[in-house]
Amino acid sequence: LELKDRSGNVIQVREERIGFRTIEFFPQDGIYLNGTRLIVKGINRHSFSVDGGRTTSAAMSRQDALLIKEMNMNAVRSHYPPDEHFLDMCDSLGLVYIDELSGWHGRYDTETGARLIREMVERDVNHPSVILWSNGNEGGWNTDNDSLFCKYDKFQRRHVIHPWADFDGLDTHHYPAYLTGVARFTNGYKVFMPTEFMHAMYDQGGGAGLRDFWDRWMTNPMFAGGFIWVFCDEAPKRSDRGGVLDSDGSNAPVGGG
């Protein structure tokens, strides 16, 4: 994109890669990518590196995205919009992404939320990896602002979700049990896609039963996949402790996950 003055002189240039794909959500059916039903094999990710903590880089984004692909996963979610270089890597490698309004607290007021939604959608709208918008995490939803996603995403109008909620045809209930409620899953009529399940952080072992959970959930024709918590343990290297990795949860220097 070139911006020129009245004399035709180029005064600003911006280059941006784009991609083409279709993404559709059908209630009581599922999510379709380029006309094919999508089962997300997802992971939740925080922006983190052992050496840099919350400081990120394009090299770190590439490393994480490649590792996620090598883990046979195809989808990523975070609690905030990621660095653009991570979305660039998702675009490039074929990973799909849930782009989420920042936070894990209560809902934003309407004015603040509206501003943040506009900033997120206008920045990320051209990334083909973004398949769903998320209006906040675990109770951070302000439904008064839901219509704004389509206002700024007026051509694709990607579906809006509320993680941890059964909302608008998509049940994203967090940490469902193996024998999750009959009404919710076995005899449910909503597309089922837990945006967090099998808490596997800090050696809790939550990921150990993945095969059993996955095989059971795949028996439901409305299962659309899910997102394990979490990609890595977020243990920073402590230069003041001889280089040990400190994963002491919320007591660690960069906070908990």
What do the PLM-derived regions correspond to, one by one?
Residues 65-68, 75-256:
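Substrate-binding/catalytic cleft of secreted carbohydrate-active enzymes
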Residues 1-70, 88:
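N-terminal carbohydrate-binding accessory modules
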